[in-house]
Swiss-Prot record:
<protein>
    <recommendedName>
        <fullName>Phosphatidylethanolamine N-methyltransferase</fullName>
        <ecNumber>2.1.1.17</ecNumber>
    </recommendedName>
</protein>
<keyword id="KW-0808">Transferase</keyword>
<feature type="topological domain" description="Lumenal">
    <location>
        <begin position="260"/>
        <end position="292"/>
    </location>
</feature>
<dbReference type="GO" id="GO:0004608">
    <property type="term" value="F:phosphatidylethanolamine N-methyltransferase activity"/>
</dbReference>
<feature type="topological domain" description="Cytoplasmic">
    <location>
        <begin position="314"/>
        <end position="315"/>
    </location>
</feature>
<feature type="topological domain" description="Lumenal">
    <location>
        <begin position="471"/>
        <end position="496"/>
    </location>
</feature>
<keyword id="KW-0489">Methyltransferase</keyword>
<feature type="transmembrane region" description="Helical">
    <location>
        <begin position="127"/>
        <end position="147"/>
    </location>
</feature>
<feature type="topological domain" description="Cytoplasmic">
    <location>
        <begin position="611"/>
        <end position="942"/>
    </location>
</feature>
<feature type="transmembrane region" description="Helical">
    <location>
        <begin position="497"/>
        <end position="517"/>
    </location>
</feature>
<feature type="transmembrane region" description="Helical">
    <location>
        <begin position="527"/>
        <end position="547"/>
    </location>
</feature>
<comment type="pathway">
    <text>Phospholipid metabolism; phosphatidylcholine biosynthesis.</text>
</comment>
<feature type="transmembrane region" description="Helical">
    <location>
        <begin position="316"/>
        <end position="336"/>
    </location>
</feature>
<keyword id="KW-0472">Membrane</keyword>
<keyword id="KW-0812">Transmembrane</keyword>
<keyword id="KW-1133">Transmembrane helix</keyword>
<feature type="transmembrane region" description="Helical">
    <location>
        <begin position="239"/>
        <end position="259"/>
    </location>
</feature>
Amino acid sequence: MAVPSAAIKASGVDMGDLKKRHDTKLDVEESVIDEKINENESDEKLTEKLTEKLTEKLTEKTSTEPIAYVGKCPDGTTFIVPETEDMLTNLFDPRITKSLTDVIIVSILVTFMGLFFVVPKSWRVPLYLFLFAAWRLAYNGGIGWLLHNQSNYHKLTKWALKYKVFDKDNKTWWHQLIKREFETRFQNQPNYSFYEVPVEFNTWILFRHVVDLILMSDFTCYFMLAWSCALSVRTNQPWWLVIGRWLAGALMLAFNLWAKTDAHRVVKDYAWYWGDFFFLKDMELTFDGVFEMAPHPMYSIGYAGFYAASLMACSYTLFLASLAGHAAQFVFLSIVENPHIEKTYNPHQPKQRRKASHVRDRSSIQLGLDQKQKDELSAIVEGDESVSIASTPISTTFDEPETVQKHSLPPLVVFSNFQITRVTDIMTVGAAVYTMLLYFLPANRLWYTVTFFMALSARLFHTLGLGVILRRQSERRSFTKTFLKFGIYPFEAYEQWQVWYNVSTVLSYTTFGLFCLRQWRAPSTDPLWPLKYILGALLIALHGWTSKSIHDSLGHFGWFYGDFFLDRKQNLTYSGIYRYLNNPERFFGIAGIWGLALMTNSPGVGILAFLWTLEGMAFIKFVEQPHMQRIYGTSIRHDAGVTKTIKNSLKLPSPFEKRVRQFQGSVDKVINDTLTVVEEFIGLAKPTLNEVVNDSKILLRQYPAKLTLTRMLDVPENIDTADYSVKLVGGEKCADSNRISYAFGTPIHVKWQASPNRSAKDWIGLYRVHDNTSPEVTSLPSKGRWSGIDETGHESHLDGIVSSSKTNGEVVFRGDTLFWECGVYEFRYHHAGKHTVLSTSEPFEIVAPKIDLSGEVDAKTLALEILPIVQRCFSLSMEFPPEEVDDYWALEEPKVINRVQAAVQAYFNVELAQEVLQSDESVENLAERLLRIRDALKGLTV
């Protein structure tokens, strides 16, 4: 049910060649025109009459002729997609003819409700809790498993083809039953024919029947669980609290109903039933309404009804069951739907080849400023009286390491990206640990005051201190000019700022956490402590998710306010969490602070949380908003997705709307006047507008295929292992070991022979010689280093097949199917998809002769020697390998980076971090780095 946050354009199908567009051709009757002309009516009246006539015909056409959409299957087949109805209409609308499955589903639902009146009262809650858990598992686990296999392997479609579910030649009773069911459902659809539509569409319809049963059973069991919990709970709450609970619950239920209905309005049945897992549909969706309020609204705010029922029932049992069910839905989203969305709508595109950028003078780094920028830089420094400049003119060249200008290691974000070689990282962690050790101080008034003011001062420094630095940097580039004074270029100044900001962030949270821990007391005396702890934990989780979403959207550059320090052209876009909120950190970004205040129930923590909130709002108004206005100007939006949706939904009558606007204006005036006083007090009075920040795309991880171990299968008696053999092709003889050897990363060809009655699922795996102790069975997984021998035997790992017949063939191992490290290996021929070994090749070696750097070798010569090694590392990669030593290499795929890293280790006995390799950009740069490492190691003793 999740959909990508962009309009779906399923395929590049030429609609004109496939179907007639339902264009509305409005032919105005000549009699109408003649009549108006004869009556000598004015042009204005004539135009008005014609417009009314056109509108009537347009309405008539659009209401009588439904829009037909074209679907496209994975094999390229196109078809007109028959119109479908939603789940509730199919099951409960008496005007629609019911199929047998509809009757069965409704009967099952009635049975679930009937159990309420049959079982004893004490059994109702456990029974429905078990049923809800079972159907929720069937939903997230069962449907998730089916969709995962359909997305990656088209498993459901292949099953339908394998068992001839929709084949005209199938005469079985169940085939006739399915045919009758489908024809009943589409009896009024002229575009549907059971045997003519693609198998993907019929498979999807059959899958929908299963989904209907699971989803309706899940909902019914949850509803009966909620009803049972409501009847089993007895509270002594006052009447006004009970009415308040039910009123709030009813409002949440109404919101939940609107969210689901509006989401279905946008995505239709096609996305509601995961149609794009089966075929793509030519339709453009406008993601407005509920899709502008929250990401994946059907799985996020669309579950508000769960918590409404828990509130109305006043049951912790139902509340915890709702939390578990909701959490399972997010697991389903992250494991099943998000990878499919990324693969379908955001496929990886290889980069175009380009030349690597070179630094002209290796002894210095050019900032790349033109004459105008140099003059502006001089004016910046000369215009600040606090910066004294020597008589030497301003220089735009700084003696800095090459890697600083080109690429640097990712900065420390809280504790992420920790580097043991960076002293600042070690000091940051040490400061956090040292702060938390203060927890063991005596619990008295003195240390209460000390820890309180530690937390307060850390936050004040983070918002007020760093806020002043950012404000002055935005207005006068004060921070950068301070570094320019000492000959340090802007990027280095920005790196120092990153350390400042991260240390301040860490100390803000650790000092606040320390104070909370010291204020925590056992909650045994508070009757509402379970609710407070659950809500507190949820607020903390919301805080963490918001912070991660902000970082994912902004990247390191936006997280550390990079546009305050570096002149980088940015386009202001709104995606990720910023599609829904202008300032998510304003409220959601402090949710965990209030969660801890709720859990500790301490006045001191509450005061800190209140001040934390005010400081954050002041930071946004006085620092971020003026800078964003200065940089982006009129491109800043005023209303975020949530605000716009609420405004569009709440259309009040004119008198009420006028009063609401007057009240809103009064409140805004009070807030603005208060903020203006504070602004004038600190001397930062500037006009303000709504703010927004940069957006970056969220990349999803790719999951490598893995070979699952299965049990050993005994060799049939009619198979003679002597008929099987695996022989190596090519290679060179090692002088010392007398083994065949292959150069590091070189493709290895293998010829095999087999018995005529071999299995199509036989396969060959690559292993280290001593990893498997038994010659008869392989005990370790191949981890993807295997190849099938017959294209009909496996669904994957068939790219390595060079030739294949019944008794012999040839396969090639390259790319991911190779070991990218030196050692002694062997190939094993396995029987029938199992791990029973029928033949083993002779041992061979993967070698990497050491390249000597001790002599006088120049970078160009060394680069030419490294180039073929690097090219092999790009085997079966989506990136272009470099063709020349100065070609830019796209080291973005993790597997390619790992291979280059292993190659450098093997050939030069030098270990380089992946980030360093990415910074080199070309083979020539890598060669230069290796020569610099050689020079640096001269004179050192090991």
